[in-house]
From Swiss-Prot:
Positions annotated as active site in the UniProt record: D12, D131
E.C. numbers: 4.3.2.10
Keyword Protease: no
SUPFAM superfamilies according to UniProt: Ribulose-phoshate binding barrel (SSF51366)
Name of the featured protein: Imidazole glycerol phosphate synthase subunit HisF
Family matches, as InterPro entries: Aldolase_TIM (IPR013785), His_biosynth (IPR006062), HisF (IPR004651), IGPS_HisA/HisF (IPR050064), RibuloseP-bd_barrel (IPR011060)
Membrane-spanning intervals of the chain: none
Catalytic reactions of this protein: 5-[(5-phospho-1-deoxy-D-ribulos-1-ylimino)methylamino]-1-(5-phospho-beta-D-ribosyl)imidazole-4-carboxamide + L-glutamine = D-erythro-1-(imidazol-4-yl)glycerol 3-phosphate + 5-amino-1-(5-phospho-beta-D-ribosyl)imidazole-4-carboxamide + L-glutamate + H(+)
Entry annotated with the keyword Lipoprotein: no
Protein source organism: Leuconostoc mesenteroides subsp. mesenteroides (strain ATCC 8293 / DSM 20343 / BCRC 11652 / CCM 1803 / JCM 6124 / NCDO 523 / NBRC 100496 / NCIMB 8023 / NCTC 12954 / NRRL B-1118 / 37Y)
Pathway: Amino-acid biosynthesis; L-histidine biosynthesis; L-histidine from 5-phospho-alpha-D-ribose 1-diphosphate: step 5/9
Family as reported in the entry's similarity comment: Belongs to the HisA/HisF family.
Amino acid sequence: MTLAKRIVPALDIKNGRVVKGVNFVNLREVGDPVESAKAYQAAGADELVFLDITATLEERDTIMSVVDAVSREVFIPLTVGGGIRTTEDMGRLIKAGADKIFVNSEAVKNPALITDGAKIFGSQAIVGAIDAKWDESAGIYRVYVSGGSKPTSLDAIEWAFELVARGAGELLVTSMDADGTKKGYDIQLYDQLADAVNVPVVASGGAGSTQDFVNLFEKTKIDAALAASVFHFGEIKIPNLKRTLKDDGVEIRI
């Protein structure tokens, strides 16, 4: 049986509040994390992702207290990232109530963090996060770090392979070209990624309409679609989205 596709709201957290930027800048505050998480659970979200956007850029501590408060009220899986540098950081977040931990920039600097995290907590708890941007001159999707501000020499597809080989049980991949545009997911990127690895891939960046989700699931083998602003501002209602997907033949939990 095909695994049901997942709809995953993302909550970017700054100073304990939910915010959403366009292309990682121009932040706009949209609410309380616990209330937002409860509302998403009630609406039928399959999982939630939290990113502490202050952690990587300004060396802040991770969002332990937010995770603890949310996990007491919400029972769908929580994936948390931002500023995670050690397996001790991972352990503290898991103890606070996170089900999965995602690591982005630090995995590029220290790939053993993925290996060690998977050994200690299991692959199911470790998510490799990638910010990817098309590089026309090189003909590759290039990996960026530090909140999408610094290019690396890495090819995103090859890096995805390595993350999985090191023990990541899932990938969370953001298209920087599409992020914040509301013009649809980067079908080419996710088609390549979903074919390249044998773990679930969560697509992030570009959702602007219900049809964008339909296109993603119909044109790629992607497992989950992440979005933020279209959900935060009520532009797309999750129950309506799921009904449309189901009507279009997408395997989804209603």
